[in-house]
Amino acid sequence: MREGSDWIEAGIALLQKVRDTQSGAIERASEICAEAIGAGGFVHLFGTGHSRIPVEEMFPRYGSYPGFHPIVELSMTFHTQVVGANGQRQAMFIERTPGLAEVILSNFQFQPKDAVMVFSASGLGAVVVEFARGARRRGLPVIAVTSIAQSRAGEMEGGARLMDEADVVIDLCTPAGDALCRLEGLPETPVGPGSTLAAVAVADAIKVRTAELLLATSKLPPVITSVAEVGRQRSDELFEAAYREHARRAARSLAT
């Protein structure tokens, strides 16, 4: 019994492909992020469905720092209920709704020094496509983290694909159906999606490289750090400093 080793091997191969083919795009994205954060701005992060996971991976958590601004709408990301109130059917319907992205964007006052990063494996839903389009219309550079194979295989709902509305495209390198493993006796339905693994890896790669670039210019904000690394007092100091810095930037970003 291989106990899931097939998926682990497929996941390793996927990460190697991302590393080997997307390093240039990751570097360009990191430069955009460093420029925005170093100037005192925000990199606004957006994703629907399971793409909220890489958004939350960026900030706030251990090893992260202010400058990344997560924007997550619970109506499109609350998946654990599955059926009934707040169920999956509603979430999938909402993320296809034209015009909603502009309503979300209207809550924020974007600065010229800001940037936007949108995560979506398919890159096809109306909300993510229109969110990226609206950000570009506001003059902001847009980074798309998406699967080119999935995007090309699917049906456009927002009049375009996310990758068509971005200045930098990072390919998750996942197959058209996302899942990585085909099991004997189950020819139609592959199992074990890979997009979350790849998206989180891309998120952390950008986070680390952006930190390096900011450190080189002495503009890296406080890094949230575990008690296990620096002790309780220092950990608390770093948490508070990071939250205060995030609050300072966020106060300028809310539309009034």
PLM features: residue spans?
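Flexible, glycine/charged-enriched surface loops at secondary-structure junctions
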Residues: 21-29, 43, 215-224
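Generic N-terminal amphipathic, Lys/Arg-enriched alpha-helix
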Residues: 1-21
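Glycine-rich phosphate-binding loops that contact phosphosugars or nucleotide phosphates
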Residues: 38, 45-207
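Amphipathic, non-membrane alpha-helical segments in soluble helical-bundle scaffolds
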Residues: 1-4, 23, 30, 196-203
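Acidic, Ser/Thr-rich low-complexity intrinsically disordered segments
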Residues: 230-256
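A short, well-structured juxtamembrane/interface segment
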Residues: 21-38, 104
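Internal, active-site/partner-interface "lid" segment
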Residues: 178-181, 187, 201, 212-238
